[in-house]
C-alpha cells in the first residue's frame, strides 16, 4: 500500500488527496466476501505506513468508512465520517464508545456477518 502511495506522490503531480476506502459488502463483494475480506488487524501497520508515506510526499490522505476501533490510534486523525450518513450503522456495542460521534461506524449493508465485532473505545 505504501508503495502505491509513494508512486502516486512521485509520478502524479496533480494529485490533491489519496483516499483509503473501507470495503462495502454489496454486490460482487458480498457474494465473494469469504475470499476477499481481510481482517483489519492484519493490515493496520500497512495503513500507518501509507499514512506516513503520504505525509512525506506532502499529499493529504483520508481514510473513509473504517470504524475507529479497527484502526491504529495514530491513524484516527486521518479517518473521517462517511459523506453518506444514511449508510452508517452502529451496533449496540458502540453506544458505550467515547469516540462514536467521531467514528464512521460500519456500513449499514454490513449488518450481521459482514463486519468485525465492535471494540468500544472507553
Positions of the model-derived regions?
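Radical SAM enzyme [4Fe-4S]-AdoMet core and its adjacent flexible, acidic
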Residues: 1-78, 89
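Flexible mid-to-C-terminal extensions adjoining Fe-S/redox cofactors in radical SAM and related proteins
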Residues: 72-122
Amino acid at each position: 500500500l505504501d508503495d502505491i502511495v509513494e508512486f502516486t506522490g512521485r509520478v502524479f503531480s496533480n494529485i490533491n488527496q489519496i483516499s483509503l476506502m473501507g470495503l462495502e459488502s454489496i454486490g460482487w463483494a458480498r457474494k465473494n466476501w469469504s475470499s476477499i475480506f481481510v481482517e483489519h488487524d492484519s493490515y493496520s501497520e500497512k495503513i500507518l505506513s501509507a499514512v506516513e508515506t503520504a505525509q512525506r510526499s506532502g499529499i493529504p490522505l483520508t481514510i473513509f468508512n473504517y470504524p475507529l476501533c479497527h484502526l491504529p490510534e495514530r491513524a484516527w486523525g486521518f479517518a473521517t465520517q462517511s459523506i453518506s450518513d444514511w449508510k452508517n450503522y452502529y451496533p449496540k456495542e458502540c453506544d458505550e464508545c467515547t469516540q462514536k460521534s467521531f467514528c464512521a461506524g460500519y456500513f449499514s449493508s454490513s449488518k450481521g456477518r459482514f463486519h468485525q465485532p465492535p471494540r468500544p473505545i472507553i
